[in-house]
């Protein structure tokens, strides 16, 4: 009887650890309520368009839709989350400005990305010619994606 209880407890613990993340607030997920995060991340998107135009962004993952955001020049939008146990967490954003748009991944499981983000904080900046990622390893913004023409 003791082994059955231990087995059921082990199964329950496994299910809790592998449950999908759902963003409840800026820095809380459903898994955080039961189990601490293994790795916590923050993604930031900033409007660095020197033309003064508004940057429209719509970011989401498989489980979380962060909604439509309009960023004025120098405004930022950030969110926090814990990477899931399967290391399959993926966030992407649609972004547009007056004369361009793009669909771009802003977080995925990749050691090179993690190194550039200093293993905790990915900062993306929309500039006139495209989207840049702050590379903390070299201390500068690096062009990641160019704008596509049109809306």
UniProtKB/Swiss-Prot annotation:
GO terms for cellular component: extracellular region. It holds the Pfam family Self-incomp_S1. Its main location: secreted. One of its GO terms (biological process) is rejection of self pollen. It is found in: Secreted. Residues 1-25 form the signal peptide. Keywords: Secreted, Self-incompatibility, Signal. Belongs to the plant self-incompatibility (S1) protein family. This is S-protein homolog 74. The lineage of its organism: Eukaryota, Viridiplantae, Streptophyta, Embryophyta, Tracheophyta.
């Amino acid at each position: 009887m003791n082994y059955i209880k231990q087995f059921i407890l082990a199964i329950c613990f496994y299910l809790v650890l592998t449950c999908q993340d759902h963003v409840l607030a800026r820095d809380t997920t459903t898994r955080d309520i039961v189990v601490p995060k293994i790795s916590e991340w923050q993604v930031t998107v900033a409007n660095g368009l020197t033309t003064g135009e508004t940057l429209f962004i719509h970011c989401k993952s498989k489980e979380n839709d962060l909604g439509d955001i309009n960023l004025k020049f120098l405004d930022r939008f950030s969110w926090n989350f814990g990477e899931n146990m399967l290391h399959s967490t993926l966030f992407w954003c649609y972004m547009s400005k007056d004369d361009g748009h793009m669909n771009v991944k802003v977080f995925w499981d990749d050691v090179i990305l993690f190194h550039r983000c200093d293993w905790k904080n990915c900062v993306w900046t929309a500039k006139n010619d495209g989207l840049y990622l702050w590379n903390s390893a070299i201390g500068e913004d690096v062009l990641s994606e160019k704008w596509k023409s049109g809306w």
